């Protein structure tokens, strides 16, 4: 049994603790679902349990024994594994090589044991029915395969608790059903699951044994499925409304003519006005496809035309575009300060070699304008702090500021308002709308509320086909839901 007693966690940019005297025991083999509004600390709690980040106060006991210096190695030694929210596996290893390293360890100059890996994999498949081409390169896996690979990797012989942080976020309905079956199989095999979600609460009610609710820094446990939604105050009463400015912007400085293929075939043409937000909405499962396209990882036929220049391949640096990716993982390296990261991205973008004091001063001035209500001392403390010191929502805001700072042509945002607390949600909304008065923004999302809040024009797609391309003022939420079968 693992027990977390009076756990307190602070972030320097938030006045009150994100987790305030959390008490949690995990002993039974159940499917636990951790629910709460954006910014309530769900992912923070998951990382503390998995030993990835430190907590400020409290203690952890395993089978009644107090643990000193809880970290990821101690968590794994006690059978606790985390399947991350936004996995970033672009390595050249084959699947069996990755599993061999994860299951059995690896020493330099020692060959990996292929037969041992295949044998353990076949033994696992008796219970979990997850089939893989073990000789396939990891970089060639799709998002569903990557998630299931991470799950298989976590199924070491000592596995007792597996934490899934928004793991079904990019699954189709069919894939989500396969994931739920896996949770049930894990339970039958004696492995408890902690499924962390915000958007799939209604579905989670159907398969979960018990719920852990995070609200206002506190933790509640219940098996009463009827009480879940009443405990969670609806976020609709706190929705921030931005003024949508549907002026007649100057037309077509940036044109996209793209044909590409992943889940479906896409043949799409659209234009970005000189200012404003064009929002593209599509299924959750294929938003990752668009991200791969703009990262240059997906081949396409066609071109992007910016100020009369044709680009027949997508390179964010060549196009001088800002890029805010999905999720909140991988936005900043753990070991660099916010200022260092801004400088590195700026110098790479502008092809600079030597750091000048003027570059640093410009970044500081930019932050002062963006965070005008912060004292100069606090801004400097933020700039020289490492990314691990901040909450996920704050890091996402800083990443948006960074991309705004370097972008020369346009800004691409993938679901920028997801997984944010109310304050960060408001700040990000205002920042994007204000930026769109100067430069164009391409918003790509599966969230209708986010789309309608931020967009001036809307392009709706389903199964690779364009259903409509209209101005925001000419379409309602109800019509979009009907059109997209939401």
Curated annotation (Swiss-Prot):
SUPFAM superfamilies: P-loop containing nucleoside triphosphate hydrolases (SSF52540)
Highest taxon listed in the record's lineage: Bacteria
MF (Gene Ontology): ATP binding; ATP hydrolysis activity
Pfam families xref list: ABC_tran
This protein's UniProt keywords: ATP-binding, Nucleotide-binding, Repeat, Transport
Organism: Borreliella burgdorferi (strain ATCC 35210 / DSM 4680 / CIP 102532 / B31) (Borrelia burgdorferi)
Keyword Repeat among record annotations: yes
Family note: Belongs to the ABC transporter superfamily.
InterPro entries listed in its UniProt record: ABC_carbohydrate_import_ATPase, ABC_transporter-like_ATP-bd, P-loop_NTPase
Gene3D superfamilies per record: P-loop containing nucleotide triphosphate hydrolases (3.40.50.300)
Transport as UniProt keyword: yes
Protein name listed in UniProt: Uncharacterized ABC transporter ATP-binding protein BB_0318
CDD domains: ABC_Carb_Monos_I
PROSITE patterns, A to Z: ABC_TRANSPORTER_2
Domain ABC transporter: 2-241, 249-486
